[in-house]
Amino acid sequence: MKQCEGMVFSDNLAAAYVAAVVELFNKEHPDRYLGRTALQKLLYFARAMGAPLPFSFEIYTYGPYSDGLSFVVEGMLADETLEDTSQDQARYSNYRITEQGRYLLEKYGEHLNPHKGVLREVVRIFGGFEPSTLELIATLHFLVQRLKRQGSGRPQEEEVVRRFLEIKGEKFPRGAVSSWYKALEQSGLIE
């Protein structure tokens, strides 16, 4: 196994999970952009679906957000295991894996391989959505999970939609929020 020189921040399992999701996304959706918001949401759903990611998420401007994940991504960019190919990096990102990033996949393969199916499924299901749709879906899912932890059992749809609209205001129409709630319920992501 070839070792890459100069990897200061990203020679760890957390970065390997990020690299795996970026690589899977680039293969599944080669013509789509993978920016900060979408990457956060894909890894949020990977964790929600059982991948043992070391990131914790809290609600933020664009839905569930992890400071730890942002730190890992910044470290990967600094170590050049990940690159941002966007033409206007101040406004948006477009992440791609590098050769050094592929080294992480090889080095941490035994840890990643048991979870590649979940990662692949997350990228397949959610990778085609626009970041704003991912924001809506992930925020709904996050709220259901939070309300479940705070109360007894699964919260009612109306309570989740009400909380969602308190957080997001008028950014999303109530009908769209309700429709996505039902879609998450039917898919089994809300139990």
Model-predicted regions and their roles:
Residues 1-191:
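Domain-edge interaction signal
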